[in-house]
């Protein structure tokens, strides 16, 4: 079907970019039933959330490393530098975050079909991100590399810190027992899902650092997936807590949306 690696690479980039649109539309009407949106009636076979997160995010580590070593630029220090933020994020998401979940005695309520779907997406995405950085990026003729990398890294790093902090707040509330509570403090005073805002910022920074269609496709798909889910989270909080929930909060972008 594909006459060359470049054709395969371009097809996957195009596929992810195009799939962002139907994903965004679908997410207006259907919220994936995990986390606070879990319902046993809609979920089918379920597994432990820590196992689900470790499984579905795992290609972002092992496949990234395998593909990276196959690229013509894998010995280039700039390629190592560029892939590092990506690996930092997914080390947290694949290893550290599941361990933090495990310590909270979570129930087996993560749908297996969602974990498998996310695993497949991460296979495709890890391939194109690692392949671009290690093989197709032209470091020798990129005069703006350091400018874009510096600005992108600031955005990425700020988003990652926000994402980790917000996850910590939510996990801390869960560990208190007694059901869901209203998260407060920091950006939780402005949006219902600062963890999603942080992740959107990360992949905006990544798209800027890589300056590639692969990075852009990932950022666009992230927005298509997380923005509607943030809106669903916001509606869920309003329905659950009613008048007690702060009315000035937005869903994901402070003061805007």
UniProtKB/Swiss-Prot annotation:
GO molecular-function term, one example from the UniProt record: oxidoreductase activity
EC numbers: 1.3.1.22
Keyword terms, alphabetized: Membrane, NADP, Oxidoreductase, Transmembrane, Transmembrane helix
Tissue specificity annotation: Mostly expressed in leaves and hypocotyls and, to a lower extent, in stems, cotyledons, roots, seeds and callus.
Known pathway: Plant hormone biosynthesis; brassinosteroid biosynthesis
Gene Ontology BP annotations: brassinosteroid biosynthetic process
Bilayer topology term: Multi-pass membrane protein
Compartments where located: Membrane
Chief place of localization: membrane
Description of activity control: Repressed by steroid (4-MA, VG106, PD91, PD17, Finasteride) and non-steroid (AS601811, AFA27, AFA76, AFA131, AFA192) inhibitors; steroid inhibitors are generally more efficient.
Top-rank taxon, per record: Eukaryota
Top-level class of the enzyme under EC nomenclature: oxidoreductase
GO cellular component, one term: membrane
Transmembrane segments: 11-31, 47-67, 78-97, 110-130, 151-171, 200-220
PROSITE patterns: S5A_REDUCTASE
Pfam families, A to Z: Steroid_dh
Catalytic activity: a 3-oxo-5alpha-steroid + NADP(+) = a 3-oxo-Delta(4)-steroid + NADPH + H(+)
Family of the protein in this entry: Belongs to the steroid 5-alpha reductase family.
Job description of the protein: Involved in a reduction step in the biosynthesis of the plant steroid, brassinolide (BL). Can use progesterone, testosterone, androstenedione and campestenone as substrate.
The protein's name in its UniProt record: Steroid 5-alpha-reductase DET2
Naturally occurring in which organism (per UniProt): Solanum lycopersicum
